[in-house]
């Protein structure tokens, strides 16, 4: 196995512990490896958790289980299918690309790197995302997000493109309780959002040219990953956007220290 640049693992009927031990064994024996391909993945959890290797790509064919890429710092994970709950949980750096949809709490507590989901995400996606100095996590959702998107968000960027698999508009966003408890970062949704769709502590802010320049590179990267045509990319960049941001940095402060507010 030493000296190999690519290794293929057939994960059919393999327990998640066995699969993850196999991945770490490969990395120990061949630290210069560039690509690991996992085939017949079906619900195995914790894939690539804690791996710190910037020049590694992990391609997954199938449906990985929960906490994909948790605590990961560096690798690129490409999922040719859907993913279960919490991909990118507390991820520090790297990229996760999901060609299908993902489950609840996608990008939970993410603190760096990028997650691109071509389809939809489940409830409470982006919960507790946080940023520090140059560490700015980014979650880009191609389709729709269920309720409580960006709950208790402390930093980072969430972008919702609101398009189907062909790049057509999905209509008005229906998610509720968006940004509940948000106290940092910003959520950008293509299309209009009503005030009654917002959660406590969230507010609709003016979308500026500076905001467009901020999200433009991530939209372009999304289009590149998923091979979207130029006309779809241009439509996304020239659409009406809604920016959702915190009312304040301490939205619940007066509940605990009213004398300091």
Swiss-Prot record:
<dbReference type="GO" id="GO:0016491">
    <property type="term" value="F:oxidoreductase activity"/>
</dbReference>
<dbReference type="Pfam" id="PF01493">
    <property type="entry name" value="GXGXG"/>
</dbReference>
<protein>
    <recommendedName>
        <fullName>Uncharacterized protein MJ1350</fullName>
    </recommendedName>
</protein>
<dbReference type="InterPro" id="IPR002489">
    <property type="entry name" value="Glu_synth_asu_C"/>
</dbReference>
<dbReference type="InterPro" id="IPR012061">
    <property type="entry name" value="Glu_synth_lsu_3"/>
</dbReference>
<comment type="similarity">
    <text>Belongs to the FwdC/FmdC family.</text>
</comment>
<dbReference type="InterPro" id="IPR036485">
    <property type="entry name" value="Glu_synth_asu_C_sf"/>
</dbReference>
<dbReference type="InterPro" id="IPR035710">
    <property type="entry name" value="Archaeal_gltB"/>
</dbReference>
């Amino acid at each position: 196995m030493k000296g190999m640049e690519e290794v293929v693992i057939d994960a059919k009927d393999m327990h998640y512990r066995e699969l993850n031990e196999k991945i770490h064994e490969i990395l120990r024996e061949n630290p210069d490896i560039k690509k690991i391909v996992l085939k017949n993945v079906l619900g195995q959890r914790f894939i690539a958790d804690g791996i710190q290797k910037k020049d590694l790509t992990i391609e997954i064919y199938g449906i990985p289980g929960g906490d994909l890429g948790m605590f990961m710092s560096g690798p690129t994970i490409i999922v040719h299918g859907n993913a279960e709950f919490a991909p990118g949980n507390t991820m520090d750096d790297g990229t996760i690309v999901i060609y299908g949809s993902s489950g609840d709490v996608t990008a939970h507590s993410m603190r760096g790197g990028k997650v691109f989901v071509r389809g939809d995400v489940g409830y409470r996606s982006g919960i507790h995302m946080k940023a520090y100095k140059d560490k700015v996590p980014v979650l880009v959702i191609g389709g729709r997000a269920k309720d409580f998107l960006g709950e208790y968000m402390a930093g980072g960027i969430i972008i919702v493109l609101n398009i189907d698999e062909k790049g057509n508009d999905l209509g008005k966003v229906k998610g509720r309780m968006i940004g509940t408890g948000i106290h940092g970062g910003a959520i950008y949704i293509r299309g209009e959002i009503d005030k009654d769709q917002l959660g406590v502590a969230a507010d609709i802010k003016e979308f500026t040219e500076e905001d467009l320049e901020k999200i433009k590179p991530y939209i372009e990267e999304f289009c590149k990953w998923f091979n979207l045509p130029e006309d779809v990319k241009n439509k996304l960049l020239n659409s009406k956007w809604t920016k959702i941001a915190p009312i304040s940095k301490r939205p619940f402060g007066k509940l605990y220290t009213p004398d300091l507010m």
